[in-house]
């Protein structure tokens, strides 16, 4: 299955100070002193030929105030996505779109809509990861009321995206910063999308953050295939991790086979032919940040090249019989394993 190489977008937060609750100044505090434009210059200088476009949170990383400076630093590279920065504002620690307090909810929605308008002015899509929309304790939340407020808020954002001619990508996660995020799995994400479809809103797709799925035990290639079948496969946030926390490690560092099968399913979906990107959502705590991004892209390109070498007709035949042994023979052949020895008596 041949196709042009996927274009890559990078979340600029990969070059941040790497803050944790244990190290509030960050493992790389020198990056905390950089402006967004300085981070972009560092990325562009070290990732020539590796990264095509960039992604930013609004208004914390990119806004009307620093747009000209950042555009100059981008040196011709594009801005592919603007991400809602609600979770970065302490005012919304107990929820923004879902807040039962009208003033808080109005402020969160107004900030998100400003972000949508900003994204539309750039021709960029908008990502909503509702990490603060949830709860931390039993008995803390009026679930039905807060869910209704949340979905109504997402609808308002989606309709503003539609008016601006851009897509809204929803991204789920099970926990952090809210301990129980409302939209915590693929099923709840699809619930939101299908509720919006019933209201006539059709410009919403899914941003698959790989580690968020792995944290849930959600098999990456299965959900890519499902989302593609429903026309919902919008964007990827590529990374890896151990599976229990949002590690945002380099692509292909763990979950290798899952990532390889995902590469195959993305090829089957012709992902990239409609302008989609492989977005990188990385948090290299202690590693050289630019080197970690470069290594992620190089490892992805290798994994994708293996997927391209898998004998697709033969694999389809094996899958029609649910023949796992034959399927792995084909996968390992693509990885360069020697041909299997003949069975005794064959």
Label each PLM-derived region with a short phrase:
Residues 1-45, 183, 187-208, 212-346:
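Histidine-acidic metal/acid-base catalytic patches
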Residues 4-26, 85-99, 130-138:
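N-terminal small/glycine-rich loop or linker at the start of catalytic domains
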Residues 4-10, 75-88, 120-130, 166, ...:
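Short coil-to-beta-strand
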Residues 36, 49-60, 88-89:
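Active-site loop/lid in soluble adenylation, ligation, and acyl-transfer enzymes
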Residues 52-55, 127-128, 237, 279:
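Conserved beta-strand positions in the central sheet of alpha/beta enzyme cores
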Residues 52-70, 137:
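Glycine-rich, proline-tolerant flexible connector loops at the mouths of alpha/beta enzymes
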